[in-house]
Amino acid sequence: MKKYDFETSLDRRNTSSTKWNIKKDEISLSLADMDFKVASEIEEDLKKVISFPIYGYVDISEEWYSAYQKYFLDEYDLKIEKEEMMFSLGVVPSISSSVRKFTDVGDNIVVLSPVYNIFYNSRVNNFRNVIEVPLLRKEDEFFIDFPSLEEAFKDEKTKMIIFCNPANPVGKIWSKEEMKKLGELAKKYDVLVLSDEIHGFITRTGKKYIPFFSVSEINRDISLTCLSVTKAFNLAGIHTSCIFAFNKDIYKKINRQINTDEVAEPNILSCTAAVSALTKGKDWLY
């Protein structure tokens, strides 16, 4: 296994870094951004793209599709068809597009708090209501309050739950049983599950996240999944993400919306970064 340097922290001040665009004596606690180098394999692949001196429009590469397919087949024995995948510039744009497509102004969106603040921003920016269902805590574990969740789902204005899997910021890796129960409740009350799985590639040693859609046929049918390599591989500045949707109606709707919102076309580095991370980054990650 190749050795990587995770001890040297690079000075990112004066590089337009959002994380480090602060005053001299301030401490940056704002973003989940790493300060050591990306995997050298990814760096080299990106350099190859840049070395060709034309930076025009690009299409989604076949390698992009096959890299995600191979990863989930190898890691989870899950077969995903090309027609069940779509490119998006980022998980956050995908969430906002989903909110606009699958809910209306004044509808309710459920979140399990505490959770990533952007989930609230997507609501505010699109004039939806957020219903918080606080997680239950027992010692060092967090659990879903299913009775309270069901009450939130019973409201006829509730159309969606944005589910963070694994949970950010508490780090909870949800069990199959928890996600199966969530899927059954969502099905019962006709609530769409948007599963944000951007942190699925990076978990504690010995702990492996479970894709929401993999738990049951119900979960597969009533959800869409948003994920990206950007958090795990420190590539957030290169806009690249993926959406999985297995229900054909859901697929058609979100595919139309991300195209309407103009977030469905890659930049010149988007596909290469994802392919390199998925096919060459495992040693760096583990």
Predicted segments — roles?
Residues 113, 132-137:
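Short beta->alpha connector loops at strand-helix junctions that form conserved
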Residues 79-85, 105-108, 220-223:
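Short acidic capping loops at alpha-helix termini that bridge into adjacent secondary structure
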Residues 2-90, 97, 280:
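N-terminal small-domain helix-loop-helix segment of the aminotransferase-like
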Residues 135-207:
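Active-site phosphate-binding strand-loop segment of PLP-dependent enzymes
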